[in-house]
């Protein structure tokens, strides 16, 4: 279930970059320059919030479309075999138990054991599983994974993530413009308006701060994984969820999911750049949390 967050974050950053460049070319950044010499901090904060939350909410609105196109997921409109029929009926039953609308159900081609859920709200979601999951997990284990994803939807994790990302975006944009202003004035000695140094420095600072701010989003993601595990235990049974996580420990293979959507999966393998950037807690910690609940 490691696809959701990287998809959201990368889409979000791409939208922010595109909007920043577009607004700069349109001259909107000029409202941040009061009397040609100093930043207008009130205007900057409003600008940052509009741009920051705008990028986040656009990413949320695009999440289902992006996930389908990036994984090649095929939505099951009419089940063509017993496996698809079981998959749709299991999600339908779990969605009813969780009190949410019936999500779209899809399958995407990948040898990994993986699944993800995304969408704008509890009644407009997508739950997708890999062919590898259907081949390598028994139905009890697969049922637990589906319940985990349904719990993400029921908990409103995508909306909460969008709000957190909006706050993070706001501060990233705000601070990057201040850094650009300082460099433009102190290093390049611009005395009136903002020169090219402000634009270039602001974009670089925005990208660097955006990467660092990812730590906050990843921490949030790890906490939500524990909650989704607990939700799965309530819907499908704790033993089934523990068995599913154990299966991942035994069968895990390097993910073939696009990196941009890796954070909405289930695997939770350790990140090469450290735990701060992990979207999922280690599997053993998740198992221990379930067993001690």
Swiss-Prot record:
Alphabetical list of CDD domains matching this protein: M48B_HtpX_like
Its cofactor is: Zn(2+)
- Name the gene that codes for it: htpX
Please state which protein family the record places this protein in: Belongs to the peptidase M48B family.
- Provide one Gene Ontology cellular component: plasma membrane
- Entry EC no(s): 3.4.24.-
Q: Membrane-crossing residues?
A: 5-25, 43-63, 159-179, 199-219
What residues make up the catalytic site? Answer: 149
Chief localisation class: membrane
Location(s), subcellular: Cell inner membrane
Positions with a binding annotation for Zn(2+): 148, 152, 225
Kindly give the InterPro entries that the UniProt entry links to this protein.
Answer: HtpX_protease (IPR050083), Pept_M48_protease_HtpX (IPR022919), Peptidase_M48 (IPR001915)
Q: Does the keyword Glycosyltransferase apply?
A: no
Alphabetically, which GO biological process terms does the record hold? proteolysis
Q: How does it sit in the membrane?
A: Multi-pass membrane protein
| Molecular function GO terms recorded | metalloendopeptidase activity; zinc ion binding
Question: What UniProt keywords apply to this chain's record, in alphabetical order?
Answer: Cell inner membrane, Cell membrane, Hydrolase, Membrane, Metal-binding, Metalloprotease, Protease, Transmembrane, Transmembrane helix, Zinc
Which species does the entry assign this protein to?
Answer: Nitrosomonas europaea (strain ATCC 19718 / CIP 103999 / KCTC 2705 / NBRC 14298)
The cofactor note reads: Binds 1 zinc ion per subunit.
What are the boundaries of the signal sequence?
none
Q: What is this protein called?
A: Protease HtpX homolog
């Amino acid at each position: 279930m490691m696809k959701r967050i990287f998809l959201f974050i990368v889409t979000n950053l791409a939208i922010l970059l595109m909007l920043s460049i577009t607004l700069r070319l349109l001259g909107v950044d000029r409202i941040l320059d009061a009397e040609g010499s100093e930043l207008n901090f009130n205007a900057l904060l409003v600008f940052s919030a509009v741009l920051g939350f705008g990028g986040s909410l656009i990413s949320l609105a695009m999440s289902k479309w992006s996930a389908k196109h990036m994984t090649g997921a095929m939505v099951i409109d009419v089940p063509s075999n017993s496996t698809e029929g079981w998959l749709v009926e299991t999600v339908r039953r779990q969605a009813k138990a969780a009190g949410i609308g019936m999500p779209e159900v899809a399958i995407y081609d990948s040898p990994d054991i993986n699944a993800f859920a995304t969408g704008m709200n509890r009644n407009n979601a997508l739950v997708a599983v890999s062919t590898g999951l259907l081949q390598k997990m028994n139905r009890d284990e697969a049922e637990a994974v589906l319940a985990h994803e349904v719990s993400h939807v029921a908990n409103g994790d995508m909306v909460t993530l969008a709000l957190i990302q909006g706050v993070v975006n706001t501060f990233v944009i705000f601070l990057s413009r201040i850094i650009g202003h300082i460099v433009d004035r102190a290093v390049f000695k611009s005395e009136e308006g903002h020169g090219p140094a402000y634009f270039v420095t602001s974009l670089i600072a925005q990208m660097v701060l955006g990467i660092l701010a990812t730590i906050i989003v990843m921490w949030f993601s790890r906490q939500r994984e524990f909650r989704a595990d607990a939700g799965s235990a309530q819907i499908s049974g704790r033993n089934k969820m523990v068995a599913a996580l154990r299966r991942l420990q035994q069968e895990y293979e390097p993910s073939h999911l696009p990196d941009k959507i890796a954070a909405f999966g289930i695997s939770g393998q350790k990140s090469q750049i450290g735990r701060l950037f992990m979207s999922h807690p280690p599997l053993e910690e998740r198992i221990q949390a379930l067993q001690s609940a």
